Amino acid sequence: MGKPKKANVATIKNVNLEKQITEGRVAKNKNKDKVKLRAEESANIDARSSQKILAAAKLQQLELDEENFPSLVTVKKVNFSLNDGHVKEDEEVNETDLMADLDMDEDDVAAFERFQQPAQEGKRTLHLSKMIMQKIQEKEADIHTKISDEGSLKIEEIDPKVKEMYEGVRDVLKRYRSGKIPKAFKIIPKLRNWEQILFITEPHNWSAAAMFQGTRIFCSVLSQAMAQRFYNLVLLPRVRDDLCEYKKLNMHLYNALKRALFKPAAFMKGIILPLLEGGDCTLREAIIFGSVVARSSIPVLHSSACLLKICEMAYSGANSIFIRYFLDKRYALPYRVVDAAVFHFLRFENDKRELPVLWHQSLLTFAQRYKNDISSEQRDALLQLLKKKSHFKITPDVRRELQAASCRDVEMMETDNGLAGQPAKMYTDADVEYEG
């Protein structure tokens, strides 16, 4: 092996600073980063950076306009999304902005109220507390019954310590605004008697933020049938009470409705259909609940089934709002649903009452979206209907749409005639692998 090399360490001599400078033995200045001149920079900017620059410039311009010309600044519209979980408590949803699309005046609102049916006692939505008390009374009347029917409420004896714990959860949920939810509350959907435990927490006294968190937890854990019960017994009464008391809806409750759409079948059966079947749905409720449907993506089958039920039930002004919102989604509806919508409009041919503008708007939406999915007989019947039920602004547009329709039976006949002249292909046994 060779000898190890010595480290090349420069010896430092005791010389004064003047000699070090003159001899050039001081450390040289390192090359600093050169600043590029603006002319030397690349002229090409990628699309993403340019979008950020334009957005920042637009935001700055809006801020300057707000400071200098506040009267010229337009009010911004709020875009709702499922991720809007952290919202201030005082933010609310008002139906005034949503009514702009419906183009209604005071006379139209009066016509809407004429078609509002009186609430039937058997159709009213029951609160969870009332239903729990009914079940307790039934159990006391029938001591020998140990197990309730499947799908009904499970009433069991509750340990005093468990009851005391959930009373503490109740106090937390009353004043909850943000933060973590108690773990004892999160396990309620997994319990067999979850309705009875939920009754201890008093859902009607929850804060709006607690209702949103509860809806998020229950819709993710419960099945479709159990989620439907939660929507019907807890969420729907709370939203309607909030609208009735404050004339507007808290943003947390609105987000809870949007979160409930994660279970679309439960949402339709537990909220929309009970709301309309009662016949006492107000215009404010119809607009706000309908906006959730209009702004969310719903599977076609669930939308079709709900639209079919709405077309077949007794009419109220709120039905037309939901029919219009569902038709505006432009889904490929089955012919059975299209036929039900046609019969829904035709049954008013001999009705002597003046129909609200909402009915005419829903008919126009149907003609615009599904004019090519109706038969020739249905088109003629609708044109005949327009002679008896007309609106000076909307009916001409409906008639024009129907007259320009390509009916489905005509298209089927043309398709069959086009295929009639073509020679039919003869398949052999080899083609279907039948030989051997």
Curated annotation (Swiss-Prot):
Localization of this protein: Nucleus, Nucleolus
Residue numbers of Phosphothreonine PTMs: T145
GO cellular component: a single term: cytoplasm
Primary localisation category: nucleus
One Pfam family it belongs to: Bystin
UniProt keyword Nucleus present: yes
Protein's recorded name: Bystin
Taxonomic lineage from the root: Eukaryota, Metazoa, Ecdysozoa, Arthropoda, Hexapoda
Gene (UniProt): bys
